[in-house]
Amino acid sequence: MVDLSKDLQFFKVFLPEFGSHELVIPPAFIDMLEKPLPKEAFLVDEIGRLWCVETKTEDTEERFCVFFTKGWQSFANDQSLEFGDFLVFSYDGDSRFSVTIFANDGCKKDVGVVSTTDRSRVSLDEEEPDDIFTKPDRMRDCDCGQSINRKRKRDSVNEDPHVLVDDKPEYVSTYKTKPEHSEKTQRTVNRAGDTCDISWFPEKKHNGFEESVYKPKHPHFVRNITRGSLQKLELPLTFLRSNGIELEEDIELCDESGKKWPLKILNHDRGFKFSHESWLCFCKSHEMILTNKCLFEFIVPSNGRCSEILVRIVSGRLPTTMTKNNYQVIDMQP
């Protein structure tokens, strides 16, 4: 299991007068780092949405500071940050910051549906690099450096970040709003009719993605595996509502081999999540690591009540896109 105690974390209280356009990273946090921050970093909220931000170093006789600059204002606007909001940043040691936001009443803010203000908000098929996750760290338990020198801290922004960018057009796809996509894929996917038969069919290699791409025939979304999602896997309410899905309290996860894992659907402050212990055991059994992605495909009968979810674990990159309802799906473009 990922050792959460090793997280590099800091917090900030949002003050619009000082933090609307850029955000100062605490110098004490910079002192903890074993390597410089990249020139471009990624902020990810609790349901897996990403924003690209630039970092800037100010090194003068008066002070030494590192900022989030370009892209931060979009993140603040999209998250509707208000005076006194409490933000916790968890850094993966590479280029990714997971952000948890608490309102001034002490409770987590409802992430809700955001409306992006510019292209600094990214979907995985557009600007996510291969190496924005931590090095693979195997799960071992189902229940769940030294400081750099001053010179290195002064060079804390790497001038040559290795960021891969795929220039792909924006594409919005959901199962119900784009039925023609499912018609194209039903001829090639799951031919045996077995709901547990999740197959991949070869396609031409494109834009660095895996050569074989699975085309789901059922409503689905894609989730990055992060430290947060290993502990708590939330189901996007926008996904469930846009596809007219009602979840049974007791469901089964069906993996690629056809093995089924029973678990419960629980209510939480923003909707629904998988029961903690059962989800952790599923993760451990499949040796999930932080570079994985999970494709969740919902088997929905005519009554709209779902009790089975197909799960495919992917280690490489996927051609995904962000829907207008702000969850990731497989890009169905030919």
Swiss-Prot record:
One biological-process term from Gene Ontology? Answer: regulation of DNA-templated transcription
Q: Which domain of life is it from?
A: Eukaryota
State a single Pfam family of this protein: B3
Q: Does the keyword Manganese apply?
A: no
Give the main localization category.
Answer: nucleus
Write out the entry's keywords from A to Z: DNA-binding, Nucleus, Repeat, Transcription, Transcription regulation
A molecular-function term among this protein's GO annotations: DNA binding
CDD domains recorded: B3_DNA
- Location of the protein in the cell: Nucleus
Cellular component (GO) terms are: nucleus
Q: Give start and end residues of each DNA-binding region.
A: 8-105, 218-317
Cross-referenced PANTHER family, in alphabetical order?
Answer: B3 DOMAIN-CONTAINING, B3 DOMAIN-CONTAINING PROTEIN OS03G0621600-RELATED
Q: What is this protein called?
A: Putative B3 domain-containing protein At5g66980
Q: Which organism is it from?
A: Arabidopsis thaliana
